[in-house]
Amino acid sequence: MPKLLYYAEDARGALQRGVDHLADTVKVTLGPKGRNVVLATSGNKVTITNDGVTIAREIELDERDENLGAQLVKEVATKTNDVAGDGTTTATVLAQAMVREGLRNVAAGANPLALKRGIDAAVTAISDRLLAQAREVATKDEIANVATISAQDPAVGAVIADAFDKVGKDGVITVEESNTMGLELEFVEGLQFDKGYISPYFITDPERMEAVLDNPYILLHEGKISNAMDFVPLLEKVVQAGRPLLVIAEDVEGDALATLVVNKIRGTFSSVAVKAPGFGDRRKAMLGDMAVLTGAQVVSPEVGLKLDEVGLEVLGTARRVRVTRDDTTIVEGGGSAEAIQDRIRQIRAQIDQTDSDWDREKLQERLAKLAGGVAVIRVGAATEVELKEKKHRLEDAVSATRAAIEEGIVAGGGSALLHASSALDSLELTGDEAVGASIVRKAAAEPLRWIAENAGFEGYVVCSRVRDLPVGHGFDAQTGEYTDLVARGIIDPVKVTRSALTNAASVVGLLLTTEAIVVDKPEEKPESAGHNHGHGHHHPH
């Protein structure tokens, strides 16, 4: 396919136009009085949202050279969303400001590589200053404040604070759609996975259609169990111990299943068979988690354990197990607290090392099941469009809150960045590197300026007033007052603010050092078709 080549000013100009198109669309959503954007997504569905990354993902520009600029900023928003879960609009505004200032300086003859070094040094200095200013999220009220600011809804803040209160900082909080109006919070204690009983004969409570085993032994088996002869020696030992048995295996079938069912119906002893969750390596990992949680060993030929040779020592225990048609919950497994902590540390290390979002999500689910439990927030609304918008806001608020618990909070409303930019005063840079740092200093005021502009105030005036206020004070765009933001509960997670700045600077550094771009040449339309289309109707003058 033939390519189009653009060089120097033409190339950078096209990239800047692309950046501006995307950023101008996203930045109208910034702040408590930011507006929404209506998106026509694939299949002509309509989404209304004020979530920066959702808007950015939908934008593809017609001009291919400009589209490259837009895609670079989309990367800023997406990366910030992956790391911190919020702050995507702030990141986009920062990127736009740095691109605009940076390209102006490049056009005036500054050295792009020196600018990039200056930008990087400035970002590190501001980032360190933000961390130094951050304070821990201590109370449930502060957690509620973070979530309220992110979702712009106090009811959401209260529900999320309750959820974190129950599951702790490593717990999983999932957001699901509900058929009823409003918000509901449900809590699942213990380890739950989405596989139910293999046969309905195992049910112990016919009214609720579930099997409940108190103080059971738990057998974890990696393969299928189909031959009763392999199984019977272990079953006899369990019957003698007088406790029920939960069997988790790839499958239980044939004679083995019949043996369990017959004994259950006769009342000889109570058991439930469940298929292991996941498949392949993930199934192995989840069985390993259950083994640690219950104090069991996974029976598998790989580790030299055969079903017909093992005794009670390979079985795990739990206070109780509840199995429904669709899921199994193990409450208070008998594993040692130390082993569970080791396993949690191991999974945390894997989360830090992985590049794949999907893997990270699955690892975090496993971590939560071991560490705390799972809270489910159900959200409902009158229409599909409103439901989507609410769900977006809730997911963002959960991410922002988790970020706040991890690294702490700073004053919100764009003022923390502005105040932290005073860290650049002590940087001893010269020449174009100093110019690079001043680009970051100017950009650091932009989020505050747009929060003010979107609320109908004069942005530059607000910025110069806030600059003179003490750290932690700033502009409350909701009321138009200059006040102590932290005391008012207007706070941002420092991780969100830092990620926004770091990711914006990373892409801008690359964009400034661009000297040429190569894009596919659009296919020519046949001449006649174009003419007929354009001049089909001649109006009399």
Swiss-Prot record:
Q: Catalysed reaction per UniProt?
A: ATP + H2O + a folded polypeptide = ADP + phosphate + an unfolded polypeptide
Q: In which compartments does the protein localize? A: Cytoplasm
Q: Determine if Transport is one of this entry's keywords.
A: no
**What is the similarity comment for this entry?**
Belongs to the chaperonin (HSP60) family.
Its principal location?
cytoplasm
Which gene does this sequence derive from?
Answer: groEL2
Q: Per its UniProt record, what CDD domains does this chain match?
A: GroEL (cd03344)
Top enzyme category: isomerase
The protein's name is Chaperonin GroEL 2
Task: Print the keywords alphabetically.
Answer: ATP-binding, Chaperone, Cytoplasm, Isomerase, Nucleotide-binding
Q: Cellular component per GO?
A: cytoplasm
A single GO BP annotation from the record?
Answer: protein refolding
InterPro entries in UniProt: Chaperonin_Cpn60_CS, Cpn60/GroEL, Cpn60/GroEL/TCP-1, GroEL-like_apical_dom_sf, GROEL-like_equatorial_sf, TCP-1-like_intermed_sf
Source species? Acidothermus cellulolyticus (strain ATCC 43068 / DSM 8971 / 11B)
Q: Is Iron set as a keyword in this record?
A: no
Entry GO MF terms: ATP binding; ATP-dependent protein folding chaperone; isomerase activity; unfolded protein binding
Binding positions (ATP): 29-32, 86-90, 413, 492
What is the annotated role of this protein in its UniProt record?
Together with its co-chaperonin GroES, plays an essential role in assisting protein folding. The GroEL-GroES system forms a nano-cage that allows encapsulation of the non-native substrate proteins and provides a physical environment optimized to promote and accelerate protein folding.
Q: What is its EC number?
A: 5.6.1.7
**Pfam families recorded:** Cpn60_TCP1
Q: How does it assemble?
A: Forms a cylinder of 14 subunits composed of two heptameric rings stacked back-to-back. Interacts with the co-chaperonin GroES.
